């Protein structure tokens, strides 16, 4: 606390990111990073751009990247916004579209940064409870609000809505922006980008951090009709005209263009997810049906926090989230097949030792 802080800063409860440990000899399954590394073409593009041009400012419009992203789904660059990670894109969207006086609606179990943005921008909000089986009930998002935010697939549950349910959300709130946060969409869920031209109130946010394995580069993006994109640009240019540096722009552009690498990487993660899910179920764990690069799991007879601690003692880090509806669960990133087998073996030992 400080007497120099503004009243707003005193009230803030900042987001707490997943641990980034200094140790290297561990299995890190807590922050949903890719186990396979970025596209070789992206790395080569970054190396090629590491030259004297770094003395110059980057393109403030990131036009080449926006063209590449739009071309992938048949849209022009005027339908695309980019930012310094999807967190920045989300923050700009909250500021641009949700200050209408009425509460913003998002699930009670979801990405915890949403609540932080509401505190930062003094936005009223209402947590809409997930069902008992951790599903989003679309009908609960009717009625007066300043907008709707739904992660699809949801985090930390990994459960995804189908496109028909996304349509229902959009039609329930035709005069408010419906933001679909698709950070994990490439791992088997249906993207809402096909609905962009049909619904002027749809904003779809994605990232390079998960399926494209560029979390360290910090590149996020959004698709929406030009009036929404213009709103985001107005916020960006009132905050930071150059959010993406030169290396980020060329690396991300090359990653977009390497479709073959993306498909191969995603398929490996999805195959490992199946093996991990089945392995956990054989050990007695409940596992939610995931369309993400992680699984959300609990054991009916074991304390989740204690399991996380015991795994850490074995140099395996997973994510345990405190909270009334999350305390019994662990979120486990899908690693390589070897990492998943090591995790399952460790859990098998823990469960056996605890039963003695």
UniProtKB/Swiss-Prot annotation:
Protein name: Histidinol-phosphate aminotransferase
Family according to the record: Belongs to the class-II pyridoxal-phosphate-dependent aminotransferase family. Histidinol-phosphate aminotransferase subfamily.
Keyword Endoplasmic reticulum tagged: no
E.C. number: 2.6.1.9
Record's keyword terms, sorted: Amino-acid biosynthesis, Aminotransferase, Histidine biosynthesis, Pyridoxal phosphate, Transferase
UniProt pathway: Amino-acid biosynthesis; L-histidine biosynthesis; L-histidine from 5-phospho-alpha-D-ribose 1-diphosphate: step 7/9
Gene3D superfamilies, per the entry: Aspartate Aminotransferase, domain 1, Type I PLP-dependent aspartate aminotransferase-like (Major domain)
UniProt xrefs under SUPFAM superfamilies: PLP-dependent transferases
Pfam families for the chain: Aminotran_1_2
Record PROSITE patterns: AA_TRANSFER_CLASS_2
Organism: Acetobacter pasteurianus (Acetobacter turbidans)
Subunit architecture: Homodimer.
Named cofactor requirement(s): pyridoxal 5'-phosphate
UniProt keyword Transferase present: yes
Family annotation (NCBIfam families): hisC
Residues that bear N6-(pyridoxal phosphate)lysine: 210
Disulfide bonds: none
Catalytic activity: L-histidinol phosphate + 2-oxoglutarate = 3-(imidazol-4-yl)-2-oxopropyl phosphate + L-glutamate
Database matches in InterPro entries: Aminotrans_II_pyridoxalP_BS, Aminotransferase_I/II_large, HisP_aminotrans, HistidinolP_aminotransfase, PyrdxlP-dep_Trfase, PyrdxlP-dep_Trfase_major, PyrdxlP-dep_Trfase_small
GO biological process: L-histidine biosynthetic process
Taxonomic placement: Bacteria, Pseudomonadati, Pseudomonadota, Alphaproteobacteria, Acetobacterales
GO molecular function, one term: histidinol-phosphate transaminase activity
């Amino acid at each position: 606390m400080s007497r120099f802080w503004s009243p707003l800063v005193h009230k803030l409860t900042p987001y707490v990111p997943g641990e980034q440990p200094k140790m290297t000899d561990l299995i890190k399954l807590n922050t949903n990073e890719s186990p396979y590394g970025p596209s070789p073409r992206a790395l080569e593009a970054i190396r090629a751009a590491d030259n004297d041009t770094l003395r110059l400012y980057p393109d403030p419009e990131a036009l080449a990247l926006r063209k590449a992203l739009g071309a992938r789904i048949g849209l022009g660059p005027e339908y695309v916004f980019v930012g310094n990670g999807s967190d920045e894109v989300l923050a700009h969207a909250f500021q641009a579209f949700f200050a209408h006086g009425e509460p913003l609606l998002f699930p009670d179990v979801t990405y915890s940064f949403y609540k932080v943005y509401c505190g930062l921008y003094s936005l009223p909000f209402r947590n809409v409870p997930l069902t008992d089986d951790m599903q989003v009930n679309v009908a609960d998002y009717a009625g007066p609000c300043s907008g709707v935010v739904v992660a699809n697939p949801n985090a930390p549950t990994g459960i995804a809505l189908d496109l028909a349910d996304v349509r229902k959300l959009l039609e329930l709130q035709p005069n408010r922006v419906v933001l679909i946060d698709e950070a994990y969409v490439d791992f088997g869920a249906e993207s809402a980008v096909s609905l962009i031209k049909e619904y002027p109130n749809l904003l779809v946010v994605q990232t390079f951090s998960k399926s494209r394995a560029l979390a360290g580069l910090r590149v996020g993006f959004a698709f929406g009709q030009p009036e929404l994109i213009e709103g985001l640009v107005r916020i960006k240019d009132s905050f930071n005209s150059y959010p993406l540096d030169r290396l980020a722009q060329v690396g991300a552009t090359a990653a977009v263009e390497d479709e073959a690498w993306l498909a191969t990487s995603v398929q490996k993660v999805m195959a490992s997810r199946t093996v991990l899910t089945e392995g956990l179920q054989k050990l007695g764990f409940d596992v939610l049906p995931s369309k993400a690069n992680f699984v959300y799991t609990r054991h009916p007879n074991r304390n989740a926090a204690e399991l996380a601690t015991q795994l850490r003692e074995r140099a395996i880090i997973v994510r345990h989230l405190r909270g009334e509806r999350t305390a019994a669960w662990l979120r486990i990133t899908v690693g390589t097949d070897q990492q998943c087998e090591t995790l399952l073996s460790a859990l098998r030992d823990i469960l056996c030792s605890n039963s003695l």
